[in-house]
């Protein structure tokens, strides 16, 4: 092992074992996948990190819910790690930082201590506070309601319901409700509130209020990722993402249909 001095005078190891390279690469790949990266990018990033540290062979298999990596080290030893991905979404800030970290690793081959430090900073990165997220949901719902033909009063009602959707999703996440049920219940609750706001005179066009809030829940990024996976040749991941997007859309539609059935009589 080679030892070198950092700027602060502390000695650090400038050599990574095969196990350390594997853990480093799969950690970054896992966070990329959880942040919304396409499968081809995840596999390519892991492969490049392994190549940077002179791994003889790397075999990576990744789908939306799992990553399996097997490496052959310089001493002809084979090692494998598997990661189960339980949840994922879209985090562009984290994607950008992870991509920068992977480029840094490939270009400079930093020591493990620095990699872990940069990785920890990314994991503990800034998150929008709940109030800001509610405000973003409200403004987005308002914009879509007006865009699709509603008036200012419809937009105001959509803002209220949009903030309520964010609060409802927070509550469902806190109790770890399964996505299929949270999508149905969130859609049904927001649909009922849309109908009630129209009933008490806070909106003129209930359809526009509903559309503005449906757009908050539509899995557009997930559908786009599925086609991106198809184009990259990752058919299994593409089918998984496509199926999830379709099922999510069906759940959203079912929730709003239930709200119309329950409160449709007051329209």
Located regions from the model:
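C-terminal ends of transmembrane helices
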Residues: 118-122, 165-176, 224-236
